[in-house]
């Protein structure tokens, strides 16, 4: 090998190493949210980068939930703390357990204790998708709520109990009866919009609409539903993200996606 060729390779190697180091430093300096999802191998949801396209790094870890049943929640619940520790080791500055039913199914006190345990295990602030719903409702001073869910009757009832324990009156709760999205398939936007609106319209004394389940794609439906129902809409993924980024010291404020996100 000629000396000029050797110098070229050394320079190139140093450039690659320098770029890698710079990328590592940038990642360390960027506020990072670690998210725990019920399914295995779940990617960072597109809602995250739609709402917050820059200035935040998102990490995802799944716990392998296969069905939305209490028995299945029990099976995977023990995987939450190891997942949180893994995300902390990857540089997360805050942890969010991004499963609504996985975090509300045993009630408000159990959900609170989960956050305590995640923080104790990682040394990081933590929240849950269920907390995102509660904080979203509080942001618009909601007291009486209509609730549309993806779940079967049992899990939907458990959400009703959780919300009541959190200080809200549940005027109506109805679910789509889904136990497994793998078996059922996705819910179309039109189906979800019409179902959610019908739940609210059947509970005229409600002052907010809740749509619960992170697998339901609600982000682009919030504004149409708020116009149709003339009431604030709080839903799992968008408002969990809003609550989660606030743990990073950010406002969470985003225009164009409904009342709560506009408040920041």
Model-derived regions: residue spans:
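N-terminal secretory signal peptides and thylakoid transit peptides that target proteins
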Residues: 1-16
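Glycine/small-residue-rich loop that forms an oxyanion/phosphate-binding "nest" at active or ligand-binding sites
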Residues: 103-125
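Conserved beta-alpha
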Residues: 118-181, 262
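Short, flexible loop segments at boundaries between secondary-structure elements
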Residues: 180-181, 233-251
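Hydrophobic alpha-helical
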Residues: 196-225, 235, 240-241
């Amino acid at each position: 090998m000629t000396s000029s060729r050797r110098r070229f390779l050394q320079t190139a190697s140093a450039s690659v190493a320098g770029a890698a180091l710079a990328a590592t430093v940038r990642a360390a300096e960027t506020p990072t949210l670690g998210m725990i999802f019920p399914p295995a191998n779940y990617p960072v949801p597109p809602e995250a980068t739609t709402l917050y396209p820059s200035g935040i790094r998102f990490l995802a870890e799944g716990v392998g939930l296969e069905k939305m049943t209490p028995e299945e929640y029990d099976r995977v619940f023990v995987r939450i703390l190891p997942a949180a520790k893994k995300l902390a080791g990857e540089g997360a500055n805050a942890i969010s357990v991004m499963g609504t039913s996985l975090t509300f199914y045993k009630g408000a006190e159990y959900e609170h204790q989960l956050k305590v345990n995640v923080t104790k295990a990682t040394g990081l602030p933590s929240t849950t998708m269920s907390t995102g719903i509660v904080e979203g409702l509080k942001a618009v001073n909601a007291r009486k709520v209509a609730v549309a869910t993806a779940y079967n009757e049992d899990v939907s009832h458990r959400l009703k109990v959780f919300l009541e324990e959190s200080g809200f009156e549940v005027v109506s709760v109805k679910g789509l009866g889904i136990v497994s999205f793998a078996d059922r398939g996705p819910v179309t936007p039109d189906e979800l919009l019409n179902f959610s609106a019908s739940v609210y319209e059947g509970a005229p004394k409600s002052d907010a609409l809740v749509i619960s389940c992170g697998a339901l794609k609600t982000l682009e439906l919030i504004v149409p539903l708020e116009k149709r129902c003339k009431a604030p809409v709080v839903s799992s993924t968008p408002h969990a993200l809003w609550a989660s980024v606030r743990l990073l010291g950010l406002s969470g404020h985003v225009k164009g996606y409904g009342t709560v996100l506009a408040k920041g």
